Amino acid sequence: MWTGKKVDSARALIARGWGVSLVSRCLRVSRAQLHVILRRTDDWMDGRRSRHTDDTDVLLRIHHVIGELPTYGYRRVWALLRRQAELDGMPAINAKRVYRIMRQNALLLERKPAVPPSKRAHTGRVAVKESNQRWCSDGFEFCCDNGERLRVTFALDCCDREALHWAVTTGGFNSETVQDVMLGAVERRFGNDLPSSPVEWLTDNGSCYRANETRQFARMLGLEPKNTAVRSPESNGIAESFVKTIKRDYISIMPKPDGLTAAKNLAEAFEHYNEWHPHSALGYRSPREYLRQRACNGLSDNRCLEI
């Protein structure tokens, strides 16, 4: 029902004898709508009704997701609900509906503080369009409840974001650990074979990556070592983002009373990341879900992202 000030003014002017066309043109009001409104009877009522939806079931499913993954925002909650709906053969839930329900029930995460832009311009692109073109690697450490420190080295594919291999140790970041991760990544993607064309191995300038033994071993496996610019963490942004994700969504909430327990739970975290963690660059699919979808459809990575 029209209740705007312009419409009310137009009706008043027409009631005083002004022409409908002149009033609609001067006030920029739809003449057709004025024509309909003026011919309504006094007892006219708007028969339209807002759609009432029962959100109880969706709210229960949302609580189930955030009960297990409390650091997930509404987009990743929606992605997991969508995946479950696809498995059950049910209609997918709209992301805006998930946002509305979570907002009404105070389940949204707090907004992150604004990050000041970097003064150093970064014009390159770390992500690639096809799998097995570029892999990236980095490391991080975290502390257990008993004070024991674990150091993790990992490798990711810069297209499908799958964690190819990882290693955890109580020692430092060394060349032997990096070589183990390299070998595990190659075996993960190529089995007992070597890449038919060199795969870029993108890392920072840590001594374990720049060591001659590491670089020689990389070339033996069909990898081409590439190092980022000095003091440019954004040049290895995919690996840096993964560190933030694994610490925020997994390490911060998993039990880690000692190193052995933490290592076991970390293995489950990497498996959950590969199999279930929705990634925005993959259309909010998990890395392995994205790979399965691509293999099933027989499509390239670019076309797969459009589906």
Curated annotation (Swiss-Prot):
It holds the Pfam family rve. GO terms for biological process: DNA integration; DNA recombination; transposition. Keywords: DNA recombination, DNA-binding, Transposable element, Transposition. GO terms for molecular function: DNA binding. Coiled coil: none annotated. Residues 112-295 form the Integrase catalytic domain. InterPro entries: HTH-like_dom (IPR025948), Integrase_cat-core (IPR001584), RNaseH-like_sf (IPR012337), RNaseH_sf (IPR036397), Transpos_IS3 (IPR048020). Involved in the transposition of the insertion sequence IS2. This is Transposase InsD for insertion element IS2-9.
